């Protein structure tokens, strides 16, 4: 199962999945009966229980499989290496562009600003 060779790992995984399934089945979605306030309160309590079940499920997986449910810390690049430049733009910030703007297909847009949302060939 899932590329493992040891049957005891598979049995442990199946046991963990069965426990998690029972947890989620024990908390069905609330019924749509009653006043708006009562329904809202039932949904709020249901979401709180779902959150608890999710946390318990993570602990069950960690216990049965021997690994944490979330990956470790990610290494992020240094802040000075990050930029907000557009990949398509080759022009530096602060320089003026005297040529006419182009569309994604490479066509130039007239200076009057006839920007068509529908594109070429579409009837307005």
Swiss-Prot record:
The signal peptide stretch is none
Q: Which family does it belong to?
A: Belongs to the HIV-1 REV protein family.
Q: Which UniProt keywords apply?
A: AIDS, Host cytoplasm, Host nucleus, Host-virus interaction, Methylation, mRNA transport, Phosphoprotein, RNA-binding, Transport
Residue spans of biased composition, Polar residues class: 90-106
Named from the GO MF annotations, one term is: RNA binding
Query: Tell me, how does this one assemble?
Result: Homomultimer; when bound to the RRE. Multimeric assembly is essential for activity and may involve XPO1. Binds to human KPNB1, XPO1, TNPO1, RANBP5 and IPO7. Interacts with the viral Integrase. Interacts with human KHDRBS1. Interacts with human NAP1; this interaction decreases Rev multimerization and stimulates its activity. Interacts with human DEAD-box helicases DDX3 and DDX24; these interactions may serve for viral RNA export to the cytoplasm and packaging, respectively.
Its main subcellular localisation, reduced to a broad class, is host cell
Keyword Phosphoprotein applies: yes
* UniProt-recorded name of the protein: Protein Rev
Q: What does the UniProt record tell us about how this protein is modified after translation?
A: Asymmetrically arginine dimethylated at one site by host PRMT6. Methylation impairs the RNA-binding activity and export of viral RNA from the nucleus to the cytoplasm. Phosphorylated by protein kinase CK2. Presence of, and maybe binding to the N-terminus of the regulatory beta subunit of CK2 is necessary for CK2-mediated Rev's phosphorylation.
Please list where the region (Homomultimerization) is annotated: 19-27
Regions of compositional bias (Basic residues) in chain numbering:
37-50
HAMAP family assigned to the protein according to its UniProt record, in alphabetical order: REV_HIV1 (MF_04077)
- Localization annotation: Host nucleus, Host nucleolus; Host cytoplasm
According to the UniProt record, list the residues that bear Phosphoserine: 5
Q: What positions carry the motif Nuclear localization signal and RNA-binding (RRE)?
A: 35-51
Q: Where is this motif: Nuclear export signal and binding to XPO1?
A: 74-85
The task this protein performs is described as:
Escorts unspliced or incompletely spliced viral pre-mRNAs (late transcripts) out of the nucleus of infected cells. These pre-mRNAs carry a recognition sequence called Rev responsive element (RRE) located in the env gene, that is not present in fully spliced viral mRNAs (early transcripts). This function is essential since most viral proteins are translated from unspliced or partially spliced pre-mRNAs which cannot exit the nucleus by the pathway used by fully processed cellular mRNAs. Rev itself is translated from a fully spliced mRNA that readily exits the nucleus.
